[in-house]
């Protein structure tokens, strides 16, 4: 069986199909895939906390960095992940796709304390994971997700439902490009 590559793709929750509250009206960036597992971050679900709250909780001086803490997914919700442009790195940074990288260490918060930050970023708690067959079933059998190649703007220029709507529009545009 051929392995679908979802790495670097966006999953856009289809309206009226995705009923899981973690993923309804969500935009998920799949940044890593093995032959068994896909790992991604929900991009458009801010929590009630902000970056300053997290810095204070972790004993790091509040840098004044503005921004929500986003819910990256229901797995490892105590873990912090920084999705950011690849113009910056920390001790545990991995290159992703589309000019993005992912960092996940305490040093990233300390760097932010000293205004050493990437051009664009989102701080996430948790991540989203699927077994590859599970994700394939959600996409092809249950038709719960639109799968689309992202553009750079969608990662950082929208928020909440606006980001989901931008994802729907991007998927529609890409489909129209294929048809005409």
Q: What are the roles of these predicted feature ranges?
A:
Residues 1-180:
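A short aromatic-anchored loop/beta-hairpin motif
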